[in-house]
């Protein structure tokens, strides 16, 4: 609850007896800047005027969003204890952030628990139960999300549409979904963003660790990804914004996942992928592809027929090393005629699997 509000009423009640001393007014102003809420409705409706918001063991009612997208500029949001959500089949999101110069963090031991097993049915967003998206970091500018511990999201975890946003030391643990029907549990989905910097993330899931669908000036570094579909660009094409530019994915590990490094563009769509660098990526236990780059996606699946409308240019693959399973493909490149160019391919050493016989239009310098 917002205890500072009670203090304010008490102070007003004392006005009839005597005017408060200046120090008391200063005290009141200071106290009223920090607000502690124990209910989602309190936080959503009463956040204005709070320079710091503490979310104390919030239980968000079924079918509602913990909406903190309209807080004052410069607000700090702190998660305390365990944040949970009531069950309902709906599209979500369960949490929404927005604003300028916002800091989002948690106190020691806090966890945001989606209890995703209530929705998991092996189908993700492809059918079955309607599952809520977890967190929208949309319309954030010059902001930081740091140290959050997120567990068992129903489907995709963090959707990013932001400008100059730092996400530091985020843990997303959906490993319970490995044997319980978790699907489409992407870690970070980025679109329509400029300046997104994800550092020190740990993601255990059943889909992309990171998926960049559009945006520029994006960095993912020091990440640890396991159980999912790897470090992905795309699929690019078929959206309102279909440009990916100036992306660096570096100093990260991918283990026990379907893919290591993946770039996919949409069949017969338009757009562009340029100035992308993957460097110092360590792979192990990869089951499908160590590196996969293909221009043939349609309705979420590869067609085997590449098109040229989303060229992949100025790509650097540098120091991608490690092992794949014996029946996995080490490197697969499927490009349209002339639509992959100006690639730099250095220090790639992936072993343990098969060589592909189906690569097409591999650009000069790359190997398949």
From Swiss-Prot:
A GO term from the CC aspect: extracellular region
Active site: 207 (proton donor), 229
Enzyme Commission code: 3.2.1.15
UniProt GO molecular function: polygalacturonase activity
Lineage: Eukaryota, Fungi, Dikarya, Ascomycota, Pezizomycotina
Reaction(s) this enzyme catalyzes, per UniProt: (1,4-alpha-D-galacturonosyl)n+m + H2O = (1,4-alpha-D-galacturonosyl)n + (1,4-alpha-D-galacturonosyl)m
Residue positions assigned to the propeptide: 19-31
Glycosylation sites: 246
PROSITE patterns linked: POLYGALACTURONASE
Cystine pairs: 35-50, 209-225, 335-340, 359-368
Locations listed in the record: Secreted
GO biological processes: cell wall organization; pectin catabolic process
UniProt keyword list: Cell wall biogenesis/degradation, Disulfide bond, Glycoprotein, Glycosidase, Hydrolase, Repeat, Secreted, Signal, Zymogen
TM regions (residue ranges): none
Entries under InterPro entries matching the protein: Glyco_hydro_28, Glycosyl_hydrlase_28, PbH1, Pectin_lyas_fold, Pectin_lyase_fold/virulence
Signal peptide: 1-18
Protein name: Probable endopolygalacturonase A
PbH1 repeats (start-end): 140-162, 167-192, 193-214, 215-235, 244-265, 273-295, 307-352
Function: Involved in maceration and soft-rotting of plant tissue. Hydrolyzes the 1,4-alpha glycosidic bonds of de-esterified pectate in the smooth region of the plant cell wall.
Coiled coil regions in record: none
Protein family: Belongs to the glycosyl hydrolase 28 family.
Top class in the EC scheme: hydrolase
Natural source organism: Aspergillus fumigatus (strain ATCC MYA-4609 / CBS 101355 / FGSC A1100 / Af293) (Neosartorya fumigata)
């Amino acid at each position: 609850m917002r205890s500072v509000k009670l203090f304010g009423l008490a102070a007003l009640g004392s006005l009839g007896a005597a005017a408060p001393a200046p120090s008391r007014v200063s005290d009141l102003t200071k106290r009223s800047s920090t607000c502690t809420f124990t209910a989602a409705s309190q936080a959503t409706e009463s956040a204005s005027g709070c320079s710091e918001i503490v979310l104390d063991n919030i239980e968000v009612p079924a079918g509602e969003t913990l909406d903190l997208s309209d807080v004052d500029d410069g607000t700090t949001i702190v998660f305390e204890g365990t944040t949970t959500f009531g069950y309902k089949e709906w599209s979500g999101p369960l949490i929404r952030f927005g604003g300028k110069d916002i800091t989002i963090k948690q106190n020691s031991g806090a966890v945001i628990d989606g209890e995703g097993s209530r929705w998991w049915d092996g189908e993700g967003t492809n059918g079955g139960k309607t599952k809520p998206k977890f967190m929208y970091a949309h319309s954030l500018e010059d902001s930081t999300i740091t140290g959050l511990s997120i567990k068992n999201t129903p489907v995709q975890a963090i959707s990013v549409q932001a400008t100059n946003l730092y996400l530091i030391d985020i843990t997303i643990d959906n490993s319970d979904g490995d044997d319980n029907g978790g699907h489409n549990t992407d870690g970070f989905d980025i679109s329509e963003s400029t300046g997104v910097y994800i550092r020190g993330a740990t993601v255990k899931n059943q889909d992309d660790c990171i998926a960049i669908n559009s945006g520029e000036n994006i960095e993912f570094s020091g990440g640890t990804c396991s159980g999912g579909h790897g470090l992905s660009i795309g699929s690019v094409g078929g959206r309102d914004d279909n440009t990916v530019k100036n992306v660096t994915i570096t100093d990260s590990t991918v283990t026990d996942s379907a893919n290591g490094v993946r770039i996919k563009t949409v069949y017969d769509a338009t757009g562009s992928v340029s100035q992308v660098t993957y460097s110092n990526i360590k792979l192990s236990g990869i089951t499908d592809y160590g590196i996969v780059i293909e221009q043939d996606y349609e309705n979420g699946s590869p067609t085997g027929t590449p098109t040229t409308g989303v060229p992949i240019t100025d790509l650097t693959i540098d120091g991608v090393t490690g092992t794949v399973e014996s029946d996995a493909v080490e490197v697969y490149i499927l490009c349209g005629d002339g639509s992959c160019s100006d690639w730099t391919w250095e220090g790639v050493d992936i072993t343990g699997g098969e060589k592909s016989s189906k690569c097409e239009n591999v650009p000069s310098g790359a190997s398949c």
